[in-house]
From Swiss-Prot:
Protein name in UniProt: DNA translocase FtsK
Sites where the protein binds ATP: 553-558
Gene designation: ftsK
One GO CC term, this protein: plasma membrane
Quaternary structure and interacting proteins, as annotated: Homohexamer. Forms a ring that surrounds DNA.
Family membership: Belongs to the FtsK/SpoIIIE/SftA family.
Species annotation: Corynebacterium glutamicum (strain ATCC 13032 / DSM 20300 / JCM 1318 / BCRC 11384 / CCUG 27702 / LMG 3730 / NBRC 12168 / NCIMB 10025 / NRRL B-2784 / 534)
Length: 921
């Protein structure tokens, strides 16, 4: 009985699923009346069709044989006990065993053989509880047995002699029942034992009292007890149940029953996932974009029904999300039910998430045998303009982050399959053939590969395993076998073998993971899932710059999409700004017009070089402000700005504002390096060397990681690497400084080395569809229009005047020489020869050029020349040598300049006394 109660929840859901599948099969087999409206309904797989694979223990062939041996031993013991207890033909040994059993459990000896037979059958059929539930089941069974023996002892009159106890509850029943009777009396001891018995049954079956009451109420026909079934019915009826009732009423000629519309009830916690995924929130209709967001939060209703991710429980989102739940309508005419055009065109996000409900709705319409009549709805009233009280002046309060519920959840991960057992046997056979003392002690199944842990015997070298890599690959019938010697943190060798049934990792699961949601870092991006089955996310601030490489089709573009979608769902435009460089012109097109952009998406390499140069100037300006305010990081600068600790000096026209983080994503670095290699490399090196504290980060992606694209200077200054499948070992060494990427199997399989990590981490990159990207982008664009910054892509070289003729082609060398001389404050020709690796003649010419421009003094024989330019004036002199106007050079605001500006302003204006209470400052 307890086992049947334990199967209650699962059987009920299986019955509903079977009925649903039978309904879809019946609909799919009927001929369609019109091609435009009748579609074949694809049956959805049951959510627990791979239940055995997911919950199966990772058992080897040895463990299975051991279980069979235990089962046969139990059968033998049951035969001996049955012969001795039931028939009295057990002989002396059997009689002795029967006496001991009677002495221990009394009358329970009569049913003990049956229990042993049942246990043996369960072991033979592998019908055992999950590993995490074994302790709970054993505790429940133990409590039931002890309580039953104590009850038998009490009902037998609490015998004091051992002969009487043999036919009652035995020693166990006496030890439990006698103290209860002496302490409480038999009238209280029996209810206490019955309650304990009931509690043991609940522990064994794993159900709650509420579920038991619902089962009992449904079994005896009481109304109002089957809440789970009502919830399923209400979920379907609320959206499409009235369509079903309308069709049935038209077919039978009865009047349709009117049911008041009501909101979906809040679902109680279940042990099984819902039959159909809940509808995902879709963005509200986009208002006319404006530079100042004027939409109130009340215009975006919040949907409290969160999608339940199969891979991991959902955690409440840290920001509200916008959603509108629409319900199809049926006209009250003699015609067949009308469907509006708006209903026939679902939102992009809900198309993918609520596919089962859409297919069921189409099946219901097709079953009617009539074409749906399109009903024209009256135009919706114009939205009421928000009042000034509804508009919050702070931009952070008027922007609502797109919810991660817009993304499609993935399927539950598999923990074990028959393929894993075959791989263990194949690897073990290879060790046996070559006489290697090593055994497979376990494995970790990831979404793409499975890592088998190999434990070596005493005196076995690790090289014996590595030398068998080709033989292992032959045994498992794949060439992409990767050895890990040793596994980090374990005294074992890892053999990574690709899975024949790969798992798709969805970005929605990564962003909805508990660790990701609890992390409040706005620049945290979802990477994917590692080989242990854990979701991997990492902050761009900690990278702080990332180099991504991989061949065509390896998953590089999918990672770029995951990065951008992660930033859109976690960061507001005031927090993170983006510069997107897309030389291919098609990869980043969906993100055109998002409010996070500093400039429109850049597709021309020349403009990309100008944008990188603009980033260098922005970095220098930020550092000057940080120096002026005595802070070392952009976080501290923004914190002091918001708290009011940093104030503009009196008389200064400068207004300090919080700086947003800037992420520059270059989709294809090779195209830029072919057009302007020197300028691109110089800008990248300068940014990656010192832009981390200024809040500027680079993400460089390329499908050709050769030495002419990823140069030594770029590699040195970009600490984090993400390598997808490469075509050769050379490319893997260029991106990772080691091999391994050439062994990856593509389609998102990657090796990730964050800053400071010694060995790469193998992950399966997250995937996001075009529909999901569009849903997130639409919601962001609906709330705010991008505010572009002028001059980001303007070519500064075209505006500069002509370089002096005497400099010629030596401008770059002259700039390096000037920077070296000014910073070291030593004008020595021999130093230029050593530092710049040039000859004496060129070094002397550079020194003469610096003398004519007032950088150094005249020659003094063998002594070093006097340096006339101070280090504070370096930026200005470099600006002048490039042919630009000195007034355009970046300058730091000194107190002398502020005093001069204050004096000039005081001469032309009237001084007003500051009075904060009156708003005058």
């Amino acid at each position: 009985m307890t086992r049947s109660i334990g199967e209650l929840g699962r059987r009920r859901n299986e019955d509903v699923l079977d009925d649903f599948d039978d309904f879809e099969e019946e609909i799919a087999t009927k001929p369609a009346t019109r091609k435009s409206r009748s579609k074949a309904v694809e049956p959805e797989p049951e959510f627990d069709e791979d239940f055995d694979e997911q919950s199966g223990n990772r058992t080897s062939a040895y463990v299975e044989e051991h279980a069979d041996g235990i089962a046969l031993s139990l059968v033998g013991i049951a035969i001996v006990l049955g012969a001795a207890v039931w028939l009295g033909i057990g002989g002396p040994i059997g009689t002795f065993i029967a006496d001991i059993v009677h002495l221990a459990i009394g009358a329970g000896a009569w049913i003990l053989p049956v229990g042993l037979i049942g246990w043996a059958v369960a072991l033979m059929l592998r019908y055992t509880p999950e590993r995490q539930a074994q302790g709970r089941v054993m505790l429940g069974i133990g409590v039931i047995i002890v309580c039953m023996l104590a009850l038998i002892h009490l009902f037998a009159g609490n015998p004091a002699e051992w002969e009487g106890r043999k036919t009652a509850g035995g020693a166990i029943g006496a030890w439990i029942g006698t103290p209860l009777e002496l302490g409480f009396s038999v009238f209280l001891a029996v209810p206490i034992l019955l309650l304990l018995l009931f509690w043991g049954a609940l522990k064994t079956t794993g159900i709650s009292i509420r579920e038991f009451i619902e089962f009992a109420g449904g079994f005896f026909g009481f109304a109002g007890f089957n809440r789970d079934e009502d919830e399923f019915d209400e979920e379907d009826d609320d959206l499409y149940g009235h369509v079903e009732r309308e069709l049935e009423s038209r077919a039978s000629g009865r009047a349709p029953s009117r049911t008041p519309s009501r909101a979906l009830p809040k679902a109680a916690p279940r042990r099984t996932p819902p039959l159909t995924p809940p509808p995902a929130p879709v963005p509200a209709p986009a208002p006319t974009p404006a530079r100042r967001p004027a939409a109130s939060l009340d215009k975006y209703p919040v949907d409290d029904a969160k999608a339940e991710a199969p891979a991991e429980p959902q955690v409440k989102q840290r920001e509200a999300s916008t959603s509108i739940l629409k319900k199809p309508s049926v006209t009250e005419t003699d015609e067949f039910p009308a469907v509006t055009e708006e209903d026939l065109a679902p939102a992009p996000a809900s198309d993918a998430v609520a596919a089962s409900r859409e297919s069921m709705r189409q099946a219901i319409i097709a079953r009617s045998g009539k074409d749906p009549v399109v009903e024209k709805k009256p135009a919706a009233p114009a939205p009421v303009a928000p009042t000034p009280a509804d508009i919050v002046s702070d931009g952070d309060s008027t922007y609502v982050l797109p919810s991660a519920d817009l993304l499609i959840p993935g399927e539950p991960a598999k923990l074990h399959s028959e393929t894993n057992d075959r791989m263990i046997e194949a690897i073990t056979d290879v060790f046996s053939e070559f006489n290697v003392d090593a055994t497979v002690t376990g494995f970790s199944r990831g979404p793409t590969v499975t890592r088998y842990e190999i434990e070596l015997g005493p005196g076995v070298k690790v090289s014996k395993i590595t030398n068998l890599q080709s033989n292992i690959a032959y045994a498992v019938a794949t060439e992409n076998v990767r050895l890990l010697t040793p596994i980090p943190g374990k005294s074992a060798v890892g053999i990574e073998v690709p899975n024949s049934d790969r798992e798709m990792v969805r970005l929605g699961d990564v962003l909805n993971a508990r660790a990701t949601v609890e992390n409040k870092d706005s620049m945290l991006i979802g990477l994917g899932k590692d080989i242990e089955g854990d979701f991997v996310s990492y902050s761009v601030q900690k990278m702080p710059h990332l180099l991504v490489a991989g061949s065509t089709g390896s998953g590089k573009s999918a990672f770029v999409n995951s990065l951008l979608v992660s930033l859109l769902t976690r960061a507001k435009p005031e927090e993170v700004r983006l510069i997107l460089v897309d030389p291919k012109m098609v990869e980043l097109t969906p993100y055109e017009g998002i409010p996070h952009l500093i400039t429109p998406i850049i597709t021309q390499p020349k403009k990309a070089a100008a944008a990188l140069q603009w980033l260098v100037e922005e970095m220098e300006q930020r550092y000057m402000d940080m120096k002026q305010t005595r802070v070392r990081h952009i976080k501290d600068f923004n914190r002091k700005i918001k708290s009011g600790e940093i104030e503009t000096p009196p008389g200064s026209k400068r207004e300090y504002r919080a700086y947003p983080y800037i992420v520059c994503v270059v989709d294809e670095l090779a195209d830029l390096m072919m057009t302007a290699p020197k300028e691109i490399e110089e800008s990248i090196v300068r940014i990656t060397q010192k832009a981390r504290a200024a809040g500027i980060h680079l993400v460089l992606a390329t499908q050709r990681p050769s030495v002419d694209v990823v140069t030594g200077l770029i590699k040195t200054n970009v600490p984090s690497r993400l390598a997808f499948a490469t075509s050769s070992l050379t490319d893997s060494r260029v991106i990772l400084d080691q091999g391994g990427a050439e062994k990856l199997i593509g389609m998102g399989d990657a090796l990730f080395i964050p800053q400071g990590a010694g060995k790469p981490q193998r992950i399966q990159g997250a995937f996001v569809t075009d529909e999901e990207i569009q849903a997130v982008v639409d919601m962001a664009k609906a709330q705010r229009q991008p505010e572009y910054t002028d001059g980001v892509t303007e070519d500064k070289a075209s505006e500069a005047k002509k370089i002096d003729a005497d400099i010629g082609n030596d401008l770059e060398d002259l700039l390096e020489a000037v920077e070296l001389v000014v910073t070291s404050q030593m004008g020595s020709t021999s130093m230029l020869q050593r530092k710049l690796r040039i000859g004496f003649a060129k070094a002397g010419r550079l020194m003469d050029l610096m003398e004519t421009r007032g950088v150094v003094g005249p020659s003094e024989g063998s002594k070093a020349r006097e340096v006339l330019v101070k280090p504070e004036e370096l930026e200005t002199i470099l600006w002048m040598l490039k042919g630009a106007d000195p007034a355009d050079a970046p300058k730091e605001e000194t107190w002398d300049d502020e005093v001069a500006a204050e004096a000039e302003e005081a001469a032309n204006t009237t001084v007003v006394q500051a009075d904060p209470s009156k708003g005058v400052c």
